[in-house]
Amino acid sequence: MTRNARPNIVLLMADDLGVGDLCCYGNNSVSTPNIDRLASEGVRLTQHLAAASMCTPSRAAFLTGRYPIRSGMVSAYNLNRAFTWLGGSGGLPTNETTFAKLLQHRGYRTGLIGKWHLGLSCASRNDHCYHPLNHGFHYFYGVPFGLLSDCQASKTPELHRWLRIKLWISTVALALVPFLLLIPKFARWFSVPWKVIFVFALLAFLFFTSWYSSYGFTRRWNCILMRNHEIIQQPMKEEKVASLMLKEALAFIERYKREPFLLFFSFLHVHTPLISKKKFVGRSKYGRYGDNVEEMDWMVGKILDALDQERLANHTLVYFTSDNGGHLEPLDGAVQLGGWNGIYKGGKGMGGWEGGIRVPGIFRWPSVLEAGRVINEPTSLMDIYPTLSYIGGGILSQDRVIDGQNLMPLLEGRASHSDHEFLFHYCGVYLHTVRWHQKDCATVWKAHYVTPKFYPEGTGACYGSGICSCSGDVTYHDPPLLFDISRDPSEALPLNPDNEPLFDSVIKKMEAAIREHRRTLTPVPQQFSVFNTIWKPWLQPCCGTFPFCGCDKEDDILPMAP
């Protein structure tokens, strides 16, 4: 690759796509010809790993090249591991540098079409401190939150009954505190500052509004379509969003075809509620989920066709992936609505099991990368940041730890061994698993210190709660569960000192790596604190009259870019 080439860059990220859902990764029941075409014309990674098994922390790591614990984009609570309210005050800190910001500074036109889910506002409704336009994107068209079942009035809300119960219990407990404090104050037993009473009363009110709004306002408040800083649909028309996003992406490519551009197309597919166009309904052999996968593949094809029509294909790096593994728990009666993770154990929300973090990884750049290559080395979504920095002709900043590695030597065939020696797999703030890729051989060891408890037992998922816990209802392993992933990728045969002579030395090496890794961590504000994640009326984006927000400006505005 010539460093002054500055290719166009198109990043395609699916939402909750299982690595086993694509034909090029072994699926024979769903048709994905366009993604398969990318794989046959490019390089396919078979051990490509998300930095987290949940969307928000995974996307934060993807954009910054850093473990999400470094930016505070992880939760210490099982209740909130991704943002549940658009009117919260947490988000990707503005002092984090995204690859979009790097490329923007190097002359690229940058656009994000689709899902964001990394926060919106800090202190007031319109400050938009976490907005994509404050993280290096010139243009944004999409959903600042995400697509949930709540966005369809006819579907069961994803704010589950157990969450509502916890919100109600918290409301009652917090409401009792100021009441109990008023008794000694008025009885003059001892003095209680009014400020303390007010704080507890305010918290009780916020928890109450979160509980109350979960019964009817979530669609109106969370399901919003924006162009740059403007709300254009509230609530969004979920059945039309995919078509609108595709139209915007094609317009972006056409507008900037004569200058280097970065287009990050962040699909709403294949997250539940699996909304597909009529022409795709019933098309696949795998029900509603398969229909949604096939519609996503069709959209990929339209983007590739646009690059071909504009004669940009040879000068464009195209990358396809997913933010995490398939979600196993969503059900419609007895029918599973989530994806398939192939031979890999576990799924979305499970900190260390392969099924939650092993994702597709496909790169196509016809003028640079050899077609049809397959790479089995451990790689990470965090690698995109340093890779794009290299491609864009820049040098990585030295003022922070970057956990990703430049993939170009591996992709071009100039290197045969991944630069990742250790990878750390977190579940929220808790380190669950460590992966060690030995420098002198192809062996990849994986040690689980914590694993989730499946319910019902033996099902391989957490159907009782909708998603597995990071702490509390988990199993701690001492010594850890050890697997040789290079020989046992399904994690079916745990090793022990009796059947693996290197067991003790491998564990010792990993524990030394954990200590070294933890020395590189510095305290940062936690974006998933209780205060940051609860709903705040003064932060709620609203087009129209609050709280009955609503508008539809989409028909009045044509696709555009700055």
UniProtKB/Swiss-Prot annotation:
An example Gene Ontology CC term for this record: membrane
Active site residues according to the UniProt entry: 55 (nucleophile), 117
GO molecular function: arylsulfatase activity; metal ion binding
Transmembrane segments: 167-187, 189-209
Mod. after translation: The conversion to 3-oxoalanine (also known as C-formylglycine, FGly), of a serine or cysteine residue in prokaryotes and of a cysteine residue in eukaryotes, is critical for catalytic activity.
Keywords recorded for this protein, A-Z: Calcium, Hydrolase, Membrane, Metal-binding, Transmembrane, Transmembrane helix
The name this protein goes by in its record: Arylsulfatase H
Encoding gene (name): ARSH
